[in-house]
Structures are given as structure tokens and as C-alpha cells.
């Protein structure tokens, strides 16, 4: 019977498993895996090429070389299967068992596993409570360790040198035992009673108060508990048996010329075997201790380098002096097993070729070269040939195909029909980088690509290549067609904008056709329909741009929605339009009014047009419409015949004067600087400002001249119209080029940046049309080269950011429809510097409302909570002027191990509520990572031209209304009657008649207010002005100045300007001060009143003291009288550097890595009143007294700037010391919502600067993953340790269990982890190991006996299952359901049988799914 079963066993059923467990293998386990001991270091006989017996390739141990044939050839063929040859000892079976059968080496002396010794923190050290240094000395035979102290004063685990040992032996005789090497360590490990240790540690933890001890104990406890829980014995960290890898996994290949190519592992194994055998012999011979010891040490080193070469000491090298690749090197890094073979496999049935444009294709088609298709679809063709009877065998079919007979081409046509192929362009930065198309066979060897999908692929036709993949199975074809077909992916998943937007020629053609010209041929004619217009145009009676009146038929949605009524009805109206627009109206889809076309179609307009079409007419109509737009665009661009020549670049005549005036101004500043009125820094700042303004002015003059041209209208009057200049039209339509580039062609090139980002103050006044002289050319290349160097570096950085983001979010999938939470965040319009940066409608579009949205005027509910807010809803909300809406967010979703659809909202790439199974984590990571790469590739396009925003120096109202100040605004009135702001965080609001906020502006410290609270103002009124170049220090009190600690050469330096000879006092940096004493003092001013008394702060006993920070230029003299609101010192703002995403990418990375900034600002820990305590050396003491009267002290370095003053009320989480915010503090003091707002806004700032749109929810998804661990503060009755970080879902599950059992649940704090940390601390060890620090992750997992439940996508890809997302999620759900029902049926049958036989019923044994090892 068994033989019969074996016969069927040939086809191996794939294993079904739900989890993978990792652990340490006991020596017995290793022996049980093994098929025999490898005793000799020999590999194969160089003459016969047969493996040596008992060697590393022994056929007896590892299996036969050829299928079903023993080594000596006595037994051949299938019939002897399973026989063991008595002559050579080889089992007759498949040769591929050589890939799976392991051997082993019995070590003559135990050896420590280097991973558990050297991978930090050393696990051996933790278990034994010894330092790594000591253990190493014992293992490598430099010292003895006491095993049993006996009755001596020695302690167990004490280290002693050899001399020590011999002295002690003389002293105590054999009263005690000490050992050397791994044997000693193994005995120590065996002696440990884990349960006892855990108990003592837990009591110690409770009783100790010192932080350091708690940390140490908790760490050790964690390791010991892991051993306790997993049932792994610590002594298994010492190897007695070494497993040997199957030979096919470390092959030895004969090359021609009698040489062999071999895997490094064979060398490493050979060394181990050689040393092991020598040691065995020495032990048999009873060699002297010192020789044996040396041999044992060498064996330990050999095993070390086999496991992880180079981890300790020098790496073992081969004959060619390069380090050998050990087992650890095989799995880690980019070329290791995980990333090279498991996550990135090469794919069969694929090809690649250059792409060319295919303007005749439909959106869902691509042109596939015939030869390529023939190769890719070979198996299908063979099959068809056999079915049709053209060929009888595969071999014959192959010949047919190779000869390319006519019948083959017919079959190819047939096979390809309705069989989509996938096109991919590297780098695939987001999911639109792979799309499916229906192939159309073409001649030639290049793939044809539809022009509209280029934006999604980021492809152009300058030699890009693309890869083609064939989905083979029916399911794969179905998924490719329904989910990946190009016509189903018309929106960007990052922001929901259309991805099939026309560009370049198409835009130019459409723009040219929809422009209007004054007094063109046939102006003012009237037509009865579009066909008449076309006839007139073809007979050259009218031009495209002529203004005419046309009757146009629009198809509008039918009001009557009863059965049988048509969906659209025609509506005829007379429009004043142009010929071109009328002709275009032919392709308008049903349901769109003509008004959307009745304007010049620029790129933005076309994008909006396609968006509108998608929302109003659905996917199909949009795709058809986009295709027709493209066809028309190409045709019209050809008709337009636009070309450019040098004369199109018109240089403005007023350029000379503008540049001349600027030069004069610069001279004036130089003069002021010479006479000492301004500092060098201010002069530089001003000069740069003048030149950027000049550059703007020249650009403006040039644009004015370029953008209009004189024309005579029908009545003979001179007028101007928008220009038909080719260059202007290209830029204006958005087809190619930008205003900045035109300015460089015909205006002036302007300021250039040095590679370090600082601006060269000499601008390039010439433009490319006039030509540059040598100096100008040199300056321009200087900055431009940086762009090229940047690109290479940043692409790598951006790719790494994307990789970390994907890794942290890869297991986040939508798993249910609604988690039922009532939490959410309040969304407001994002206002910065008075500008609405992002309107409320954009922020809430596609989100689910969490509270009812109420009409503020009638108080009726507009949208109930749980409504998905779509375009119509957000427009309505905007129209009613609702300020804030509470919406669901991924951050507050209560789903465990995933997200729910309601908290996520709309799937931006599809335009409807997200489906269960969507891998929203990966999409978020792609959406954030993709523009990073895009932008880095774009830094150099403007050729390094300085794009420095002129600094704001005033703020004006954008709308009419009433000025309101926030509660934080404080100001004083100075002697001139001006109001000077002295608050740091004051804001001015403009409200409308009903009191709704229209805009808000931050008013900086030291600004002069021009409007006061309650003033009614008109749009354009200035609210406040300030000096943008310096930051003042202002006194709130009047009096006589008395300097303290202002000593020249100690705290301040006299700066004498080399040019002007004038001096100012500058506060010097603490680090540059000489003596220790001067480091702790802070230069400051006290004020004296008329009686010479110190001026006190009203209501307190504290004297007024105003400190100067580093870099301040002191403008008052000692003993000078000052009035309220006067400036005591100025702090120059730093020289501006140009910002591009170069600063941006690292900024995004540090936000997601949750790094604490270097000089972080300090936030108030409690709400209360501030006061200053006694200063200590180098620090000032700030005390906050909370509402209960408890005092909280902060010690603040003297040079830091304190934002609060005496007796000010601060709120918890408010910034009290200036500096960048620390996200960890925000989370601790202000909670998750504030943290999320901070990270989202900061990340968005970086991208917005580059004009990149990313939806907030993607960033929120990442933040959710950064918050997925919690720190246990009180463990209650749970299995956690206080201070331990655990997965939030785990903790909630455990707490639920505790509550169900009436025990105490654990309490916890939220922890913010950076993305790298979060990826490594995930519960899945497979995912973490394939990300970074493979050794450390695997070491830790093995000790803890970790179990990976294969929840994420990455783990499943690695073990080769369908991923639990999309269609795979449904598959896994169905599989689990089937298992459950099978188990129930099994129980039922068992119960019935038990009942039938009248046996006492016992619960049937459940078939468990063992976790795969």
C-alpha cells in the first residue's frame, strides 16, 4: 500500500499553512534533519568528477547525482525507486533531493553561535548577565570562568586569568571548578533556572527605583521571558552539531581546463571539517592542553566565519584575497536571498523594447511588434497549432513557428485578440507604472505607446524602453483587463486628478484652435449649425480664430427620469464663439454644456475639462472624449504650423533703463555700507533683493510686450489683443516652457546660485538672445552643474525614502466596511500668511463626515454623519461658508490589523468609496515617494536661476471686513504714537459681517500695526509693516539703560567694519567665549527709573531684565534714556539661500523618521502661569505654576530665546522656548490629532513649494503606522512588562481578554516611531528581516521563538502565497471559511460516530494546522 501511495506522491501538493515559526534548533533537531555525518573535507574527485564518500558532496548522504541512478550505476531507472544500493550506499531517487537533504558535522568541542554572541545587544551576555567582553575572553580561551565556586570565596561567573587560576588551584585545590571555552559557557547556561530568574527579576523590578536598573532588568527579563515562553533552552545557543547545507545550494561547477568554480561556503565548510578532524585526533592523542586549546579556538573561529564572516576579527579570505561570502551574507543586503530572489524575481514571458509614439491607437491599445508577440505568445500558438491539426507534436509546432509560415501569423492574430499584455516602465514609482493594454500587431521592432498614458508612466520618446509582460492564466487576464487596463486608470491615486491629460503638441493645437482674434476673416458671421461652420472653414471663408455666432446643439441630462425616457435630450442655443471652438463642440460628450469649451483651452483648463467629464459623464465617455481631444489636438497643431525663430524672442526696450536704475540703487547701498549705515550682511540682502526685483521687472516688461500685439478692429480703431507670438503661445497654453524660461531667453537671466545654495550677488543681465559673455557663461555653468550632480544623488535618496515608506505601510489593507468609530478630526481651510493655501473643499473632498453637517443659517442637517462628501456636497458646504467639518480619518480608525473603508473615504484612483482589500498603505507610500523622485529629477531645469521669494515686509487684507486680534496679540504705543507688536504669536483676523473668519495673518514681533482691533477696512489695506532684514528686541518699559554683563571681549565684541570703520557691539557665541565664567553669563539690560531704582514688572517684585541673544547688534548705549516700544538691539536674519526640494527631501525624511530636531523648542508641560526662578550657571530657570499650585521647573540654556515673559499664562503644549518643534513632545502634550496636523502640514509644505499635490490622507496613513506601537505604563494583569513597546492591536486584544476575564487591563502611552524603526519593530519577522539589519532581526526572532502570522503583503510574497489584498484577500477569506466549515463537519461526523457506537462522547481531536518550521 505504501509503495502505491508513494507513486502518487510524485506531484507534491503545495503546503497550506497559516503561520511560520522560527526558533533555535536543538542538537537533536539538527541531527534529525541530517541524512548523515560529513566526515571528510573532500568535495569531488578531480579525475572522475564523482563526489568523494563522506565528503561535502557525498552521494550517500545527500542523494544521487542523476535521477533514479545510484553512484556506481548498479541500479538505474524508475523501477528501483527507493532502493539503497549495497555497493555505494546511495538511495535511488530524484537528483533534486540534493537541494533539500542536509548533513551535519559532530563538533569535537562545542562552539558558540556568533550571532547570539556578537549581534548587539549580545543575547548570551543578557542571559548570563556577563559583559560581552568577558564572554568573549572565555570563548576564545583567554580566561577562565568559575562554574562552581564550591566552599571558596569565589563567585560563579567570575572571570580569572590563567595565572589567577593556577594560584587559586594551589590555594583551594579541587574545591572549585573553572572552565575555559564554549564548554564552560554551556555549563553556565545549563545551570540557569529560567523560571526562578524571571521571578526574581520581576520582584527586583517592583522594588527598585533607579532608572538605569529598571532598564537593565526589563531588558534581561524580556530575553528570559522569551526563552520561557518559547520553550527554547539557552544552551542551544552553543552548537554541538553543525548542520551542513544541501550541496546543490552551494554548487561546485567544473569549468573547462580542469578548474572548478565553487561557492565560498565549500571553502568555509572545509576549514571547519579540517580543524574539527585535527581536534578529534589531538584529543585522542591526549595532546598538551595548550595545543588543544589553540585548536579549539581555531575551530570556534572557523565556525564563526562560516556563519557570519567578518563579524569578529578579520574576515577569512580565499585564494584571491577577497573575503569569503558566509551564510549570513547570503541572505542580507540588496544582493541577498530576501531582496534579490524572494522579493524581486525575474519574470518569464516578458520582453523589452524602445517605445515610439502611437497617435492612431485607442487609449486601451498598444502597438506590439510582430516578432516580439510571436516570441511572447509561443505556448498559445503551439497549442492552437495542435488543436487545428497543423502540427502533431510540440516539436513540429516549434518548427512551424520558427519558419514563420503564413498560418502562424493568422493564429497569432487570433491568440492575441482580447488577450491584454502589461507594459511597465522602470522606475515603477507608483501603481500607474504598470498598466495593461490590448496589443495591436505592428511591423517594426519598437513598441507603440498611446501619448496620453505617457504622463502616468513618466515616459517620453527620446529612447525610453519599456517591458512587456504576458498574463498567462485566465484569472490573471481577467484582473489585467478589469483592474489594470489603461482606460480604467484615468486618475492619479495620489490626488484624484486625471492622469490622461493631454500635453505638448495636443495642448498647443487645442489652444490655437480655441483662441480668438480681433478682426479675423469672416468676423461676425452667423451660422445655423456646426456643419455650416466646417464648410465655411474648409472654403477658407473664415479662420479658426474668427468670432462668429453659431447655433449649437447640446445634449443635456433629461429632467424626466421615468421609464423609457431618454437619458439625454438635445437643447439648441445660439452662442457667440469662435470657429475653432464650434468645430470642437462636435466631440463634446453627452451631458457636458458647450460653455466648458467656450474659452481658450490651456493645459489647466483641459485638465479641468477631463475632470468634469469624468465626474459628470462617467469613465467610458471620458476615455472616448480624451481620445478624440487628442486626435483633434494633433490635427489642429499640424494645421497651426507653429514654429519659433530668434525674432520671436522680443527683448523689451525698457530693459536698459530698468537695469541701469538697479545698478544705481546697488551703488547707493555700497555707499551706505562704506559710510557704515548698514552691515555687510544687510547690504548683501538688499542687493540680492534689488536684483531679484529687477529681474522680475524686466520679465514683466518683456511679458507685457510679448503677450499683446497691436491690431486694427473692424471699425478701424487701433487696439491690442493677446499676442499670437509662437513662444508666448507655447508658454501660455502650458504646452512647453514657462515664464521663467522665456525671461531667460528674452529678459535677463537674473541671479544665479552657487552650488552651496547661496546667491551670487552679481546677476547675469544678458539673456540668451543677446548672448552671454565669458564671465556670465561661467557664472551660469557654476550653478547649473549642481543640478546635474544633485539629480544622481537625490534619485537614490528618494528611492530609499520610498522603500522605507512602503515597508512601514505594506501590511495596511482595508479589511472592513466600517469600524463604527465616532472619532475624527476637525478640518479647516489651511491659511498661511493670509493666503488660503488649501481650501476646505479640497481637504474634505472624498472623506466621510463623522458629525452631521449643519446649515449655519437654518440649522437644518445637510449631510448626516457617515455620508461620503463628494463634489456636490463640498461645493454646497463651501457656498454656505461653513468653516469646519469633522471627518473620519485613518488615524482614529478602530479596525485592528487594517483599516476600514469609512475612515479612509474615497479611493482617489477610482473616484468612489474605497473597496475592501485595497492596499491603501502601499498606495500612500507610492503617492509620497513618487513625487520625491520626480522633483529631484527636476531641480536643474531652470539652470540654477535663483528663485528666492522676495521677503515679505508687510501684510495686507485680501477682502473687506473687520479687523479682529486674537487673544495672544499684545502691543505698546511708542513715543511717535505707533503701535508696536510685542507678542510672539499674535494674529490678525479679518471677519465678514456675520463674524465668520475670512482670512488670518500672523503678525511678527516688532511689527508696526497700522489698523487696530475692530477697524472696518477695505481689501488691499495694509494691516502692519516690519523690517524683513532684522528682528528687533523691543522694550515694553521706559527708563535709563543699564547694561549687565555687556563686557567687550567677554560677552560682546566690537565689530569694526573693514570698509566703513564704524563700530557696533555684537553679542558673541557662547562657544567662542574664552573663560569658563563668561560662558554662563548672559548680556542683558536693566532699566532704571528717575530715582535710579530698577524698574519692576507691575504686580511683581521682579526687575525688568531684557536679555540679548547671540548675534544681536546692540543699538543703545549704556545710560541712554529709552521710551516704551524703542528698539534696544537688532538681530540680522540670515542670508537667504534658495529653496528647492534638495532641502525638501531630507526634510520629509526627517519628519517621517520622527527625529528630534537639534535645538528643539521647549513646550509647556502644563497649563499655568510662568515666572523666572534663580538662574544657575549657564542656565536660566523658568517655573510654571499650574492651576493646583504645583511648580514645574525648566532649565533653559542662556543663549536660547525664551518666548514667554513673567506672569504670562501659557497653555499645555504651547511653545515657551524658541526652536523647531519636536514631534514626540507634540504627541505627548497635545495628542494624536495635533501631531498628525503638524506632520501633515510640514510634509505638505515641502511638496506644495514644488507644486505637487498629495492628498492628506496618504500622509495620515503613514502617521498611523508610525503610531502603531504603544508603551505599556502599567501592565495590570497582562503578560506585558512595564516600559515594553507592543503592537497596538495586540495590546487591545489582550486588554479585551482581560476585561472579559474581569482582570486588570494594561494602560499605555502612545509612542511615535520613525518609519525605519517602525518597519523593524513590526510583529512580522520575515518582513523586518527583508528590510534592514537582517541578522539582528533574525537573532531576536529565533530566541523569542517568534511566529509570523503572514498578515502583511511582503511576508506573503516571500513565502510565495497570494497577497492578502485585492482579489487575494477574498481568496484567503474563502480559504479560512472553508477550513472552519471542514473542521465543523469533522467534529460533527466524529460526534455522530461516537453517538452511534454508544461510546461516552469525548470532544473530537481537532486537526491543528501546525506552524511550518
Curated annotation (Swiss-Prot):
Keyword GTP-binding in annotation: no
InterPro entries, A to Z: DNA-dir_RpoC_beta_prime, DNA-dir_RpoC_beta_prime_bact, RNA_pol_asu, RNA_pol_N, RNA_pol_Rpb1_1, RNA_pol_Rpb1_3, RNA_pol_Rpb1_3_sf, RNA_pol_Rpb1_4
CDD domains assigned: RNAP_beta'_C, RNAP_beta'_N
UniProt-listed Enzyme Commission number(s): 2.7.7.6
GO molecular function: DNA binding; DNA-directed RNA polymerase activity; magnesium ion binding; zinc ion binding
Annotated residues for binding of Zn(2+) 1: 70, 72, 85, 88
Keyword terms: DNA-directed RNA polymerase, Magnesium, Metal-binding, Nucleotidyltransferase, Transcription, Transferase, Zinc
Keyword Transferase appears in the UniProt entry: yes
Binding-site residues for Mg(2+), renumbered to this chain: 460, 462, 464
Gene Ontology terms: cellular component: DNA-directed RNA polymerase complex
GO biological process: DNA-templated transcription
Residues involved in Zn(2+) 2 binding: 819, 893, 900, 903
A matching Pfam family: RNA_pol_Rpb1_5
Swiss-Prot/TrEMBL cofactor(s): Mg(2+); Zn(2+)
Cofactor binding note: Binds 1 Mg(2+) ion per subunit.
Catalytic reaction annotation: RNA(n) + a ribonucleoside 5'-triphosphate = RNA(n+1) + diphosphate
Subunit organization: The RNAP catalytic core consists of 2 alpha, 1 beta, 1 beta' and 1 omega subunit. When a sigma factor is associated with the core the holoenzyme is formed, which can initiate transcription.
UniProt record similarity statement: Belongs to the RNA polymerase beta' chain family.
Record function comment: DNA-dependent RNA polymerase catalyzes the transcription of DNA into RNA using the four ribonucleoside triphosphates as substrates.
Protein name: DNA-directed RNA polymerase subunit beta'
GN (gene name): rpoC
